[in-house]
Amino acid sequence: LPTLLKKASLFWFCLVLSSQLFADPQSSNLGAGVSPQRALLDQYCVACHNQGIVNSTTVDGESILFSQLRGLGLTLDTENVDNVAENPEVWEKVVRKLRVGIMPPPDNPRPDNASYAAFRNWLETELDRASSTNANPGRTQAFHRLNQTEYRNAVRDLLDLDIEVAEFIPPDAPDQHGFDNNAEVLSLSPALMERYVSAAHKVAELAVGATPRSTTIKTYEVPLNLIQDDHLNDDLPFGSRGGAAIKHTFPVDGDYRIKVLLQTNYVDFVRGVDQAHEMEISLDGERLGVFAFGGDAPGTPAPYSYAGNIRGSDDWEEWSMAFAEGGFEVNVSVNAGPRTIGATFPREMWEPEGILQPRLFGYHLAVTELPDNNPSVGAILIEGPLSVDGPGKTPSRQKIFSCIPASADEEPSCAREILSTLARQAYRRPVDGNDLQGLLDFYTQGRSQGSFDTGIQFALERLLVSPDFLFRIQQDPSGVGPGDSYAINDLELASRLSFFIWSSSPDAELLNLAEQGLLRNQDILEQQVRRMMNDERASAFIKNFVGQWLYLRNLDSHYPLPAAYPEFDENLREAFQRETELFIGDQIHADQSILKLLNADSTYINERLANHYGIPGIYGSRFRKVELDNPQRAGLLSHGSLLTVTSYPNRTSPVLRGKFILENLLGSPPPEPPPNVPALEETGNDGRILTMREAMVQHRENPACRVCHAAMDPIGFSLENYDAVGKWRQEFANQPIDASGTMPDGRVFDGPAGLRDLLLDQPDDFVGTVTEKLLMYALGRGLEYYDMPAVRAIVREAAKQDYRWSSVILGVVESDPFRMRRAQL
């Protein structure tokens, strides 16, 4: 009986609630003497967001929607909208929901668009006014560990040594916003500390040129589905096709063995051996050897192993011996340091076009893997050193050994000079006697066990595991009260700036200015930002910020289903990523408006990508900037990179695409879906393949899903003309694609061009989201409600300069959250 009473009570409560939801807004008694803002909330919002719902108890059988409202905890009936300073956190949440008009939910009364926009603008203005009298710059973590990329770059700039960082330390997981430089998730476990200790030892050995304890073999694999019919790399000879060029750091001067393996499929079959071919191996562009193989070519063919008759055909029996496992080898004397090893095929006047299909487990071999197609490079192996001639004159040794002691008496002073120089850059601050003595103690220990170089190696190992190197450390200065805001010092500002733009330590110029206390000067700070953005190290900004903001990093782990999209290969994957990186990098360096991301009529493509997009007249593997005359390819939203990572392996997903745009371009991420959401039905009851729109109509029958999908789905459907690998199409399931949509606020649009216009119609929302992402990345923390006034201030100033990239980046650097910090409470 009690349960029955509870259900009855819930029924009557929901009945009353629904009558409020669907009441005629004009008939509501708004009350006398209330503000327009209070009246609007009472009329359109309080029916769902009130303390009665929030404080109600859970009842068996209640709807998911009712549970969601309770869990949201939003009580707009008790919040004082006339004084938003009392609870700015709540009102910033409201502002975010108002961005795309997601509230009130579909089919509920809502204000007219003018009233809606006026209420949002009023809220933002009041929040900004309240913040101006009590600004909170937020608090970054006191200990901010370098992530994997930052560690690699810091080692590179410190020692002039580019390491394969993945061999030493694992990648870092991104935070909830998609960035892997958030201090809160960059913890240091005992196991990870062991990896850093091991990495320090190996890096120090390599940097000083210590003789390796044993011969090693390093293997560089070439992706199986990389098509090698064209010239692929500028480090390979002009007029060659396919192959690979890899960068390898040789530890010492000496003899090494270079071995090249041909690409095989999943049963070790090597293609192309019925024709005569040549393989060329080079070192830094100089030919080391040419090997003839295949057909009746002279020379030593690759070793064979028998694999049997695959299908019983006479033709296959004839070629069943053509399995290469031994590869091609050359021994060479190499000077220590970074070198480029190339393996490629000299291009013939005419040769067949080979297409290596991806692995199709469970299927027969593709016809394009028959033996009369082009061979390709599968791996390059470096073995050595087979003999050692000495440490050599490597860039890292030249960077480390700023002095060479002529006698034992000169060694202590030389060691002090070397270590003080390295420590200053590694610790990103001036070093004192205690810093230096700790390193000299390790130098002395190493010197007693070997040479002067060994002593420096020991000290370098100690430096690379120091908390001052592995962490960016910020401490509250003395004299600052709990919770007070203060300006960070120039050295902290230098590190914050360099890790924002370069993902690395400050260089000498930046450190010198910081030590002199000049960096906080606004003119000097702006000059440094522009200098750094024009430095080649700023490529890290494109790679890391853009790569994570726009999910480009996800391309490496995204595999469209070969049976559905056989045209997708490694060449296309690389072209997708390169296009977006070059596209955005060009706009930043040209200081264009951020809005150009959406409607630019140019992009960067090569022949492979041009063919995929249907753009004629582009030849060769080199990327070049092209003007577009087809609006289907205008702007970022037409890039294959974004369209692929926001699709499933076997089909497009309006939900993923809509969610991506809401979260990353409009700053209005939808909440997580309720548990146990069923998968989309791909066929109807009659067995007919459903269009995506038909499948989503069924899905939205759940009221708990309808609210979020009201905004996600129209945006996602606008891109439905692009398939799951970004190719334009007019039909799906033998039916014309409907790419039209209506936003919750009533705005109607059609296709990608309509979506672009929709985004450009409210530029502050798009630029504001880019600014939020930039500020998150720059600070290494998520943004809070108290950061939003600073974001809006940056956007307002940027609007005066047509939202140019420089105005937003400089706005971030000059903002209170970037230049200030709040003391521990």
Predicted features and spans:
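N-terminal secretory signal peptides that target proteins for export/translocation
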Residues: 1-6
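Surface-exposed loops/turns
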Residues: 252-253, 335-336, 433
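Aromatic- and Gly/Pro-enriched helix-to-coil junctions and flexible linker segments
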Residues: 21-224, 230-234, 281-284, 342-406, ...
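Long, His/Glu/Asp-enriched segments that create or flank divalent metal/ion-associated functional microenvironments
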Residues: 234-240, 244-264, 269-271, 276-285, ...
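Histidine-centered active-site/metal-ligand motif
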Residues: 49, 339, 709
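Bacterial N-terminal signal peptides
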Residues: 9-20
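Extended, folded domain segments that form the structural surfaces/walls around functional sites
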Residues: 211-243, 258, 308-309, 317-320
